[in-house]
Structure formats: structure tokens, C-alpha cells
Amino acid sequence: MHIRTMALVLFAGAGQLLAQAALQPAQTTVPTLEEVRKTMGIPSQGDVRGQQDAVGFASKPEQMARVWELSITPPLPEKLGEAPPPGVAGVICPHDDYIFAGRVYRQVLPLVTAKTVVLVGVFHRYRRFGSHDVLVFDSYKAWRTPDGDVPVAGIREEMLALLPKGDFVRDNAAHDSEHSLEALVYWLRHMRPDLQIVPVIVPAMGFARMQELAGRLASVLAQEVTRHRWQFGRDVAVVISSDAVHYGADFNYTPYGDGGVDAYVKACEQDRSLLRGPLAGPVTTAKVEQFFSTCVNPEQPSEYRLTWCGRFSIPFGMLLLERTNAALGLPTPIGHPIAYGTSISLPELPVRDVGLGQTAQANLYHFVGYPAVAFTVGE
């Protein structure tokens, strides 16, 4: 999702709507928790995280029920391959407005059936928080959803106790400012009421640092999986949040011209090539690095090459999956591209009558891609 509610512009201090995928200027003062909560659709309270976006995402049970009901109605998103059976080890799912992306969410999230889900999200505003080269966790005990609160799994504290202190920070304001995980949690909770989560958002970092952090988090996650006698897919899964290309002048990304049919076709084909290329088949370090280097300048990771907002969440999440499975003595995870859509490829879900809407324009000069990938434990 690329523009939140009007209140978010308070961070920018200039009154200008900023696309989330666009490069954001550095901010001298880190937003306070109080400032961030003023931008939330439903502010966090006490030990429970609230909701950043109450326009593009469901905030009431009847809204979530309607989205769920309608998201399986035709026309369906473009099919890239056969979906594996439910019980997958991980997925990549978009996080744009339900009105645009709901049908793509529905193609991939029901494949996740585990009770415990490690959520790997985008940190869109990492520059404003001065965050880089660390993993960002929260301290909340639960997250609010339309269907009821979701507890944070106890393994979060167990894992953080084992990680080097320099590998992570805990920042509730950062998580309150971010929408990329809440969008997915609401679907997961709707499908499984006993869901528990471990949320983490990933700011900018180089690939070498990413490998270090993923390796150490994988090691402690594998310890917890072993201690609890869990199985990947059955009991625990990794869910990665990311939209695909953000095309248009607002995103500072117009390699095929300002927009129009030809630019749209070329941008979508570029997305498909990534989904069928480094995101497909056995997960290897070389393929993960290929994706990383396609999206960012490896020498200056904050510089976009291709505007996938999950330029850090996807490679980190894939490395986490691969290294956790290796630590458990399991086969290499296999990527299965399932579906692809964009903010203009399908009709809107008819949910405006229950209070859902859009947070940004969607047209041939301003569009966002939606990837759907599942990961299974290979044979």
C-alpha cells in the first residue's frame, strides 16, 4: 500500500502526500510514540497494538467477513502455477488495499495453516526512524484485529533472549507507523482464531549483514521449533509481506515512460520475470542475492533499482526460511509462484458499502503489483 490516511503527512512536515515506495527524505527528529499514534486509524493502547490503516483494511468483523466472502469471486488473479496443498512453510503476500488486492491475498494466505506465524514485514519509514542494519521487533502482548486480539507468541521473548543485543531493537512506535503486517494478520486471524504471531519489520541493510541476521535468527528459531516439537508448515510458518512494482511519477519510477498501456505491460512482465526467476524453485543464497541486487544498489541499499517495497523483507524472509530449514536438517525450501495481479488488473471488491475504501489512486500512470508465492519444504 502506497499512501495511508491524510494524518500520515504529519511525519513529513510539508503537507505533501508521499508514496511509500518512493525514497523518503531523512528526518532529523525521530517520531515519538505519541506522534505516531495520532496517525493511526485505531491507536494502540497499553499492551495491545491498534491499527494503522482503517480505510484500506478491515477494522470491523462484518468488513472482514465481506472481504473474505467476495475475495474468491471471479475474475480471479492471473495464475502463475499450481498452488501446493495447505500447510506451507511460508508465503509472500501483498499488503495493498483490500479493495484492490483482496483476490490476491485469498490465493495465497489460506495455504498458511500453522498456529504460530513469524511475520516478516516492510519498514516503509525506516529513514524517518533512523533505522538500519537491525531487526525491529515490538513489545506488545497482542495485536488488535477485526475478529479479536491476536497474542504475540511466547517464543518472541525466548528468541530475543538468545540473540546478540546488536541484532535487534524493540520499537513500538516503528511498528505503530507500519501497515505491512497488520494487513496480513487480519486474514490469518479470520482463518485461524487461535493464531499467535511474532512480528518483525526489516529496514535497509546490505546483503552481508542480512545474511548474518537471518542466520542468527534462524538458529534461535530452529531451537524453539525443536524445543516445542513443532514441524514447519504444520505448526509454524513464515509469512513475508511485500507489494511488487510501484509504477508512476509519484514513486520516482518511470523506466518505460510516464505510464500508459505499454509501460504497464512492460512493468508487469518485469514483475513476472522475478516471480518465475529468483523467487521460484529451490531457495538459494545466489537467487536471493539476485533478487536483492535487482531491487536495490548493493553498494547503497537505500537506493532503489526496482520499486518492490519488500526489497528487504523478501530476501530476509527467504534467507530465514532457508537457514531455519538447514538448521533443522530439512530439505531446501521450494518457491511456488501462484498468482499475480495489480491495482488495475481486476475489478474492485464491492466493499465500499461496508466502509472500506482506497488510500491512493489506481490507474495506468499510478499502479502497484501484487505477488503471491508459497514455499514448501523440498524433497
Put a short name on every predicted segment:
Residues 11-13, 88, 333:
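Intrinsically disordered, low-complexity segments enriched in small/polar residues
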Residues 9-11, 228-230, 363-365:
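Generic marker of residues within folded, mature protein domains
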Residues 5-16:
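Bacterial N-terminal signal peptides
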Residues 1-2:
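N-terminal secretory signal peptides that target proteins for export/translocation
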Residues 17-21:
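Boundary at the C-terminal end of the N-terminal hydrophobic targeting segment
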Residues 22-331, 340-346:
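Active-site histidine-anchored catalytic micro-motif
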